[in-house]
From Swiss-Prot:
Protein name: Large-conductance mechanosensitive channel
UniProt keyword Ion transport present: yes
Membrane topology of the entry: Multi-pass membrane protein
Native species: Rhizobium johnstonii (strain DSM 114642 / LMG 32736 / 3841)
GO CC, any one term: plasma membrane
NCBIfam families: mscL, PRK00567.1-4, PRK13952.1
Sequence intervals crossing the membrane: 14-34, 38-58, 81-101
Key word Signal present: no
Family: Belongs to the MscL family.
Gene Ontology molecular-function annotations: mechanosensitive monoatomic ion channel activity
Subunit structure of this chain's protein: Homopentamer.
Length: 145
């Protein structure tokens, strides 16, 4: 059973999946930075300078802080702003992945169409076969006596 597991892990598909997960994790960081550092400040500037990540509702009377980090130290909070930020991250990531998959599928379909459209040319027959074909044709045209 251990050998089967080793064979399974060593197969290309599992290794490809592992690489994909690692790259996906790194890509997630890029998307998070895109949202947090570029998109959310623009949204904040357009809609009056607010930042979703600090939006929360206190769930106890002891919470009176103005920032989410301080409010979490004081007690329970409903941090809906953090959820909105994560939701925006997800939507951007899903959109980018959709566009990538759509592009790959379009390229595959185009390659398949080109392969179907291009007639498969047979290589010319060897010289001896061409010579024998010419002799056969000459003999066939010769009058029989």
């Amino acid at each position: 059973m251990l050998n089967e597991f080793k064979a399974f892990i060593a197969r290309g598909n599992v290794m490809d999946l592992a690489v994909g997960v690692i790259i996906g994790g790194a890509f997630g960081g890029i998307v998070k930075s895109l949202v947090d550092d570029l998109i959310m400040p623009i949204v904040g500037a357009i809609f009056g300078g607010f930042d979703f990540s600090n939006y929360f509702l206190p769930l106890s009377a002891a919470v009176n802080a103005q920032s989410l980090a301080a409010a979490r130290e004081q007690g329970a909070v409903f941090a809906y702003g953090s959820f909105l930020t994560v939701l925006i991250n997800f939507l951007i990531l899903a959109w980018i992945i959709f566009l990538m998959v759509k592009g790959v599928n379009t390229m595959r379909a185009q390659i398949e169409r080109q392969e179907k459209a291009a007639p498969e040319e047979l290589p010319p027959p060897p010289a001896d076969v061409q010579l024998l074909t010419e002799i056969r044709d000459l003999l066939a045209r010769r009058p029989t006596a």
